[in-house]
Amino acid sequence: LISGNGANVGYIHYYKGKFNAYQRTYVLDQWQQNIIFIQYFLEQFLKERIYGEKKEGNTPYIVLSTLSEMPLLLPCLEEQTKIANFLSAIDQKIEVVAQQIEQAKTWKKGLLQQMFI
């Protein structure tokens, strides 16, 4: 899914299953490529394209040609899968570390409160 308008124009989210797509939500569902690889590719390169081409009015938006005319440099499917799996594993590790940091902050806050009681 790609948000086509509003403050989050260009926001990309991978979703598997049923969902409601509203006006100006672009759904990428007919791919013969690794969709997770496509997501990482678009997250890397779509934002700068959007900000170069977005239309301004009361609400910023993009049009279909912003997406359909974007050149995609795609390696073979096997390589896409390897890259997507690698990047997904890194994202999972980042999430674990982020949770550990939040737990450490909570622990630190509790210790500081006990010190000054």
PLM features per residue range, with description:
Residues 19-25, 55-78:
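A short glycine-rich beta-alpha junction/loop motif
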Residues 1, 11-14, 18-21, 60-61, ...:
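Residue-level preference for alpha-helix termini and adjacent loops
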Residues 1-20, 35-40, 48-54:
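Short, ligand-facing micro-motifs at secondary-structure edges
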Residues 37-40, 69, 79-82:
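Short, solvent-exposed alpha-helical surface patches in well-structured domains
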Residues 73-117:
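Amphipathic alpha-helical coiled-coil/heptad-repeat segments
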Residues 28:
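Extended Lys/Arg-rich polyanion-binding regions
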